[in-house]
From Swiss-Prot:
Active site: H125 (proton acceptor)
Gene name per UniProt: cobB
Family: Belongs to the sirtuin family. Class III subfamily.
PANTHER family: NAD-DEPENDENT PROTEIN DEACYLASE SIRTUIN-5, MITOCHONDRIAL-RELATED
The protein's name: NAD-dependent protein deacylase
Superkingdom, taxonomy of origin: Bacteria
Cellular component terms (Gene Ontology): cytoplasm
Reactions performed catalytically: N(6)-acetyl-L-lysyl-[protein] + NAD(+) + H2O = 2''-O-acetyl-ADP-D-ribose + nicotinamide + L-lysyl-[protein]
Pfam families given in the database record: SIR2
Source organism per UniProt: Desulfosudis oleivorans (strain DSM 6200 / JCM 39069 / Hxd3) (Desulfococcus oleovorans)
PROSITE patterns the UniProt entry points to: SIRTUIN
Binding site residues for Zn(2+): C133, C136, C173, C176
Record localization: Cytoplasm
EC number from the UniProt entry: 2.3.1.286
Amino acid sequence: MNLDNAIHEAAKVLAGASRAAVFSGAGVSAESGIPTFRDPGGVWDRLNPAEVGDTQGLLASLEKNPEKLVAMFMELLAVFDAAIPNPGHRALFDLERMGILQAVITQNIDNLHQEAGNTQVIEMHGNGFRFRCLKCRSRRSHERHALIGRVKERLSTLPDFSPASIFAAMPDCDLCGSGMRPDVVMFGETVMEVENAFAAARSCDVMLALGTSGVVTPAAQIPAEAKASGAKVIVINPNENGFARVCDIYISMKTGQALPRIVEQVKKIRSGS
C-alpha cells in the first residue's frame, strides 16, 4: 500500500471511530526538537542514560564529575524550554475535539500532549514538570517554562554541585514540608499508570501507535492488547514498524506530516464532502 492510500485508509478507519486511543513514544517528541536516545551526536551521546538513568547511577555520576553532569543537564533544560507542540500533537487535539480520540497513552515526559490541548493523557513514565513528595507522595505540577527558569537560576547560585546541594535546591512539599523529586520513572522503577493504560487499550476501537519502536515493556504490549480486544491498529513511524504482528495500516512517515493529512481527510469524510 502506498502512502497516499495508507493515509486514506487510516482516515476512513478514524472517521468511523469514537473511542480511539494513542500510544506515543519518543519519535513524536523528536519532531519538537527533543532528542531520542538513538539520535547520533545528541546530548545522550555524552550523557549515557544507562549510567545516569537510575538513582544510584545519578548519585555516582554527581560524585565523580558533577560539573559535566550539571552542564549536560542545563543543555537538556534548554532543549525542553525551546520545545513546542508540533503539528502531530495539534492533530491529536483535533481528533479529541471531534469526539474520536478518548485517550493518549504516552511514554514521553515533556507535557507537550497536554500543552497541545489533549485532556485525557496517561503518562507511563511520568511528567518532568511535576514533583512528588518523598514522604506523603503528594504531587505538584508546574508550568514548564517557569519551572525551567527557576531550576536554572537555582543551579547557577549553588555553592557547589554536590548531591546534597542539588537535592537541597529541590522544592519542599506544601502539605508536609518534606523534600520532593521529579515525578518521572527512573531506570529500574515501576512504570506508572499501567492499569489505566491497558484499560484504555482494551476499550478503544482504534489504536494509533506513534513514533515508538515497541521495544520497552510492558508498554510495548499496549497495541497488541488493543488488537486482541478488537481494535484496528494504525502505526505511524518513519523508521520502522515495531508492531508488524498486530498492525492493520502502516504509514512510514513522521507523525507531524501524516497526522494533519489524516485529520484533514477525516473531516472531509465526516462532512460528506
